[in-house]
């Protein structure tokens, strides 16, 4: 009593307290970062190693395996995958959430150092690592185009000047430059000219290497001067290499230009990048795992003018893709939804109270509670994101509930003739415990969420804490500011004021009277109501089992990623043509704004595309509908497939897959894996629950096997090393020398001119100089035959792995797909040597599915414990919790009606309903108990009176919560895929709960009261006997 009086009779102090809360909230709001979702990125580090010319199997056994054994000992590694292709290996390490990325990086470097002695000596450089997830979509893509500069020169500008500067910006984890390679001097040898001159490829390599030497020459001194010695020992350009003498034939000099075409070109000609229809260099920028995407993008944009000034004017630097606009638009949509929710909630209050003065009170209390929450969000290190703003939107209905309960009870006393200050004190005292019970039990719902681990726990923590803080501040405001404003602002209603909104008032009275009549009938037919209640429990179980489920709603971020997978024997020239064809198909689509792509590198038969869609306001279709439309057009391209997927704000795992979800096959028997993977993939491709089924197992590439006749080699004076060196010199784009420039180092690359390697007969033109100086054709001691070889070798942990990726067709859920995959694996009878498991997002979905029911039960148990403590009763909490089955039925039916799968967002809605719908029962039970204790009423009379007395606040609080969530259901635009499932769940649950709990709660109350009386009589009877 004294607590309430302290604030009611000291209005200045109360107002200043509220102002302080508001000011702190405004300050916190201005300092909060902006993000699409809470920070849930796993710490990921990528280790890269190269050995030019080495086969995928060689890279896997000699490079990947030693590194994996060393890296696998690092603490906190949750997943380690590797992919080895021609000349390169990439290992992805995913760490536990609580692992510090910088500490992990130090451990990775130590593990690389420990494995160094086990790696091949011919590696041009030590393995390197990057603190970025290569499977993440870039947060920004910059393109360089020019009509005057070559692709190699553009790549040089990008990698030498732009990429290092961008990498230094806070939040940037990796800048990947694609579309070409560094400039180089390329030596294209003519095998016939070499044969005619009697010059071996090794002779050419040695001559070039010896002619380009960078070593110190020292200095000369006399008594007074010192001269630094400088020589022309370096060759910089193709023109300087052409006259180089490599051999003397019959006294005549054989120059490099006589036997080769020397050009200023690039290190690897098998790279291509495009933006729209123009050749381009791409800078794909990825953020650090812990970085804020909006802040990072803003920092990059702020540096762009400076970057532009460092490159020539003839080079056009453009932003091809930026993920931040759709994120900002999504947050603006949520903010608008929040404002609409506040307005609707206040409108509900006005309609019920029919007083402008009374409406001002919750109109002040709601903003104070919501704004004050921003301060706590800042102190907790949160961000303004879709989930935290959705929490505030939902909180609108919650925070007004406390104010409504207090305000309505004070208004009831005023209508009875009590003076304002006395009514404020008496009314607050009566409902203070009710408000406390509602708030604490609602906060209790979120305790299991706060204790939940893994990605779902991280994802929901900000939502739970934000909502809990808003409820806590609302509790404080409703017991301090609200009664003070009521005491000083409200007056007894005058007849003229009571006539306002007479239509709504009469309707409410008629509704209350009709409810009273129906409630009397229900209380006389309690068994029927009990059957209905048991039926809702059974219906809940059936609906939850049958409803389609997924991990997270499929978002339309306005960005698509595409992975090109072509025939494994395709040439680079043909692959570049496929890239151009696919880009034209996509560029012609009316919903596409920009498209960039690249192909080449160590995996010639693959490529990547990044597609920016037009803003949501300029297109009628969703991203998934656009993908469905494009899929039909892309399927007509022969010899290659382009798999499209919408970029999501949440992506789990480090695998670079061509689809959104993955199923990984593991085996310690590589032969068994290669035998069963095609069977499983083909089976999964026939399932209607899956789309775009593809695999990263590529073991059918074209290979030419050379078989040496060692006896003949020995007789001819040729060893295997010389023969292998010949092949590397001829076909391996061998880097034979380094050109040092002030800004970078460039390579001299030697190979047989591509004009002479158009078919297999090129091998017949190759020759080796033996130990007698004679030219011996390769065909004298070797024969060759075509065969198949892997283009890549993949590991997970230390086991051979193959990952099957898939998307979901329209109308299918992840639970449908996972169940279909499990059935298919059973039907195929896959042996125990091949193990299958879901990976990435699909794996997290499986883990979340197993914990959902436990989480809901834990939330209910927590609420029961809190209510039991507050009411000092084992029974009354059960009465209050009896409201939950009807809410669950309403929520699940609404999701099925709107064809929305049960996702993590819908789970939040269910948890919220646990907190919302019990409020009605709390108000009924509290007033019924008070009536029994102080009014000498029977239990049936007490609960009947409590239901009628609290009918208006029950309707107000329910409608306030419903209208607070309704904008989430009706919202469109960016980010609506996240908001709608939450709104649908809450609105559906509230509607069904309101229809049933007004009748089931009184019946359950009487049932438990009779049960209590029956058990209390038995001990007495035993004593008398």
Curated annotation (Swiss-Prot):
<feature type="transmembrane region" description="Helical">
    <location>
        <begin position="3"/>
        <end position="23"/>
    </location>
</feature>
<feature type="transmembrane region" description="Helical">
    <location>
        <begin position="897"/>
        <end position="917"/>
    </location>
</feature>
<dbReference type="GO" id="GO:0005886">
    <property type="term" value="C:plasma membrane"/>
</dbReference>
<dbReference type="InterPro" id="IPR001036">
    <property type="entry name" value="Acrflvin-R"/>
</dbReference>
<keyword id="KW-0997">Cell inner membrane</keyword>
<feature type="transmembrane region" description="Helical">
    <location>
        <begin position="984"/>
        <end position="1004"/>
    </location>
</feature>
<dbReference type="InterPro" id="IPR027463">
    <property type="entry name" value="AcrB_DN_DC_subdom"/>
</dbReference>
<dbReference type="InterPro" id="IPR023931">
    <property type="entry name" value="Multidrug-R_MdtC"/>
</dbReference>
<keyword id="KW-1133">Transmembrane helix</keyword>
<feature type="transmembrane region" description="Helical">
    <location>
        <begin position="853"/>
        <end position="873"/>
    </location>
</feature>
<comment type="similarity">
    <text>Belongs to the resistance-nodulation-cell division (RND) (TC 2.A.6) family. MdtC subfamily.</text>
</comment>
<feature type="transmembrane region" description="Helical">
    <location>
        <begin position="360"/>
        <end position="380"/>
    </location>
</feature>
<dbReference type="Pfam" id="PF00873">
    <property type="entry name" value="ACR_tran"/>
</dbReference>
<keyword id="KW-1003">Cell membrane</keyword>
<keyword id="KW-0812">Transmembrane</keyword>
<feature type="transmembrane region" description="Helical">
    <location>
        <begin position="528"/>
        <end position="548"/>
    </location>
</feature>
<feature type="transmembrane region" description="Helical">
    <location>
        <begin position="463"/>
        <end position="483"/>
    </location>
</feature>
<comment type="function">
    <text>The MdtABC tripartite complex confers resistance against novobiocin and deoxycholate.</text>
</comment>
<feature type="transmembrane region" description="Helical">
    <location>
        <begin position="387"/>
        <end position="407"/>
    </location>
</feature>
<dbReference type="GO" id="GO:0042910">
    <property type="term" value="F:xenobiotic transmembrane transporter activity"/>
</dbReference>
<keyword id="KW-0813">Transport</keyword>
<feature type="transmembrane region" description="Helical">
    <location>
        <begin position="953"/>
        <end position="973"/>
    </location>
</feature>
<feature type="transmembrane region" description="Helical">
    <location>
        <begin position="875"/>
        <end position="895"/>
    </location>
</feature>
<protein>
    <recommendedName>
        <fullName>Multidrug resistance protein MdtC</fullName>
    </recommendedName>
</protein>
<feature type="transmembrane region" description="Helical">
    <location>
        <begin position="333"/>
        <end position="353"/>
    </location>
</feature>
<comment type="subunit">
    <text>Part of a tripartite efflux system composed of MdtA, MdtB and MdtC. MdtC forms a heteromultimer with MdtB.</text>
</comment>
<keyword id="KW-0472">Membrane</keyword>
<feature type="transmembrane region" description="Helical">
    <location>
        <begin position="431"/>
        <end position="451"/>
    </location>
</feature>
């Amino acid at each position: 009593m004294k607590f309430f009086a302290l604030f009611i009779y000291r209005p200045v102090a109360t107002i200043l307290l509220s102002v302080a809360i508001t000011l702190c909230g405004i300050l916190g709001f201005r300092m909060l970062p902006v993000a699409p979702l809470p920070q849930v990125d796993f710490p990921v580090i990528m280790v890269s190693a190269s050995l030019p010319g080495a086969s995928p199997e060689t890279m896997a056994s000699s490079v990947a395996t030693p590194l994996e054994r060393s890296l696998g000992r690092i603490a906190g590694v949750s997943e380690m995958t590797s992919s080895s292709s021609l000349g390169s290996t990439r290992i992805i390490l995913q760490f536990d959430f609580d692992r510090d990325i910088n500490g992990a990086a130090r451990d990775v470097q130590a593990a690389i150092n420990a494995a160094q002695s086990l790696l091949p000596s011919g590696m041009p450089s030590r393995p390197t690592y990057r603190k970025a997830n290569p499977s993440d979509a870039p947060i920004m893509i910059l393109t360089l185009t020019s009509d005057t500069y070559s692709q190699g020169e553009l790549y040089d500008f990008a990698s030498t000047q732009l990429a290092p500067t961008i990498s230094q910006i806070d939040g940037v984890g990796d800048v990947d430059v694609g579309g070409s390679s560094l400039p180089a001097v390329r030596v294209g040898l003519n095998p016939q000219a070499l044969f005619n001159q009697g010059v071996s490829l090794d002779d050419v390599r040695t001559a070039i290497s010896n002619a380009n030497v960078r070593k110190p020459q020292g200095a000369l001194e006399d008594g007074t001067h010192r001269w630094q010695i400088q020589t022309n020992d370096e060759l910089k350009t193709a023109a300087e290499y052409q006259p180089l003498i490599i051999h003397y034939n019959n006294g005549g000099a054989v120059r490099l230009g006589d036997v080769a075409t020397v050009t200023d070109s690039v290190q690897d000609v098998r790279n291509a990048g495009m933006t729209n229809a123009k050749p381009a260099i791409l800078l794909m920028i990825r953020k650090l795992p812990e970085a804020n995407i909006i802040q990072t993008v803003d920092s990059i944009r702020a540096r762009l003018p400076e970057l532009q000034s460092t490159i020539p004017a003839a080079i056009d630097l453009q932003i091809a893709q930026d993920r931040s606009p759709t994120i900002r638009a999504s947050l603006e949509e949520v903010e608008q939804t929040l404002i609409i929710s506040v307005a609707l909630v206040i409108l509900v209050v006005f309609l019920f109270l029919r007083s402008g003065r009374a409406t001002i009170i919750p109109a002040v209390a709601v903003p104070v509670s919501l704004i004050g929450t921003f301060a706590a969000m800042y102190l907790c290190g949160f961000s303004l994101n879709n989930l935290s703003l959705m929490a505030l939107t939902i909180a609108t209905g919650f925070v007004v509930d406390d104010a409504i309960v207090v305000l309505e009870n004070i208004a009831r006393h005023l209508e009875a003739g009590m003076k304002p200050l006395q009514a404020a004190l008496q009314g607050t005292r009566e409902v203070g415990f009710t408000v406390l019970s509602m708030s604490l039990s609602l906060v209790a719902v979120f305790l299991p969420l706060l204790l939940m681990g893994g990605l779902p726990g991280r994802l929901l923590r900000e939502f739970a804490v934000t909502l809990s803080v808003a409820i806590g501040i609302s509790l404080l405001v409703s017991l301090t500011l609200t009664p003070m404003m009521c005491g000083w602002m409200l007056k007894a209603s005058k007849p003229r004021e009571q006539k306002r909104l007479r239509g709504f008032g009469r309707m409410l009275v008629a509704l209350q009277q009709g409810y009273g009549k129906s409630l009397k009938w229900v209380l006389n037919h309690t068994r029927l109501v009990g059957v209905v209640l048991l039926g809702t429990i059974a219906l809940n179980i059936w609906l939850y089992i049958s409803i389609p489920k997924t991990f997270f709603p499929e978002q339309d971020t306005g960005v698509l990623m595409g992975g090109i997978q072509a025939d494994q024997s395709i040439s680079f020239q043909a692959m570049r043509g496929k890239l151009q064809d696919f880009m034209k198909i996509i560029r012609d689509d009316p919903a596409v704004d920009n498209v960039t792509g690249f192909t080449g590198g160590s995996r010639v038969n693959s490529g990547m595309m990044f597609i920016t869609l037009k803003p949501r306001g300029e297109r009628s279709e969703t991203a998934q509908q656009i993908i469905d439309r494009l899929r039909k057009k892309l399927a007509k391209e022969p010899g290659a497939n382009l798999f499209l997927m919408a970029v999501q704000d949440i992506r789990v795992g480090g695998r670079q897959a061509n689809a959104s979800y993955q199923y990984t096959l593991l085996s310690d028997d590589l032969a068994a894996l290669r035998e069963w993977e095609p069977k499983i993939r083909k089976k999964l491709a026939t399932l209607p629950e899956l789309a775009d089924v593809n695999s990263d197992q590529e073991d059918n590439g074209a290979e030419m096997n050379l078989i040496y006749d060692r006896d003949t080699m020995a007789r001819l004076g040729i060893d295997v090393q010389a023969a292998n060196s010949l092949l590397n010199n001829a076909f391996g784009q061998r880097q034979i020398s380094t050109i040092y420039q002030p800004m970078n180092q460039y390579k001299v690359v030697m190979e047989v001119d591509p004009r002479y390697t158009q078919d297999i007969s090129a091998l017949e033109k190759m020759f080796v100089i033996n130990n007698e100086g004679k030219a011996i054709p390769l065909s004298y001691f070797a024969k060759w035959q075509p065969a198949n070889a892997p283009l890549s070798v993949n590991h997970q942990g230390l086991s051979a792995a193959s990952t099957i990726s898939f998307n979901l067709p329209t109308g299918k859920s992840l639970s449908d797909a996972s169940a279909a995959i499990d059935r298919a694996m059973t039907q195929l009878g896959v042996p125990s040597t091949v193990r299958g498991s879901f990976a990435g997002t699909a794996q997290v979905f499986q883990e979340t599915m197993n914990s959902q029911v436990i989480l809901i039960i834990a939330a209910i148990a927590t609420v029961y414990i809190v209510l039991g403590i507050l009411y000092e009763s084992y029974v009354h909490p059960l009465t209050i919790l009896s409201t939950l089955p009807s809410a669950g039925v309403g929520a699940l039916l609404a999701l099925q009606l709107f064809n929305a799968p049960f996702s993590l967002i819908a789970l939040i809605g269910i948890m919220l309903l646990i907190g919302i719908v019990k409020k009605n029962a709390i108000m009924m039970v509290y007033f019924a108990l008070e009536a029994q204790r102080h009014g000498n009423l029977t239990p049936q009379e007490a609960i009947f009176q409590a239901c009628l007395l609290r009918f208006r606040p029950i309707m107000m609080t329910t409608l306030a919560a419903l209208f607070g969530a309704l904008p989430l259901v009706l919202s469109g635009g960016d980010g609506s895929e996240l908001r709608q499932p939450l709104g649908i769940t809450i609105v559906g649950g509230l509607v069904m709960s309101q229809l049933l709990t007004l009748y089931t709660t009184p019946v359950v109350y009487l049932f438990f009261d009779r049960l209590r009386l029956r058990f209390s009589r038995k001990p007495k009877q035993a004593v008398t006997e």
